[in-house]
Amino acid sequence: MNGGICPTCGLPKELCICEEVAKEQQRISVKINRRRYGKEVTVIEGLDPYDIDLEDLSKFLKAKLACGGTVKDSSIELQGNHRERVKDLLAQKGYNMENIS
């Protein structure tokens, strides 16, 4: 049990800025892929699975966008075309808007 200590930097969780630094440095791409029967899937790539909890981010996005989705490798797939709304939500979560394409 860590007792509130960040495993990356060793600081208490209240003082840890590891996740904020990781959010600022990542280059994220948001693309639309077509699947079978003409279904569209929004794919978010460029996220580092070691610095950011992809499951937690995926859960947040699925709840805000009211859609289904999954985490595959180091990308998040959301059902439907949500490109612009995903960019806004990522910026709201603290990601640098200039690094989202």
From Swiss-Prot:
Alphabetical keyword list: Protein biosynthesis, Translation regulation
SUPFAM superfamilies in alphabetical order: eIF1-like (SSF55159)
Any Pfam family hit: SUI1
Molecular-function GO terms, alphabetical: mRNA binding; translation initiation factor activity
A GO biological process held by the record: translation reinitiation
InterPro entries (alphabetical): DENR/SUI1_TIF, SUI1, SUI1_arc, SUI1_arc_bac, SUI1_dom_sf
PANTHER family, alphabetized: DENSITY-REGULATED PROTEIN, DENSITY-REGULATED PROTEIN HOMOLOG
UniProt family annotation: Belongs to the SUI1 family.
NCBIfam families tied to this protein: PRK00939.1, SUI1_rel
Stated name of the protein: Protein translation factor SUI1 homolog
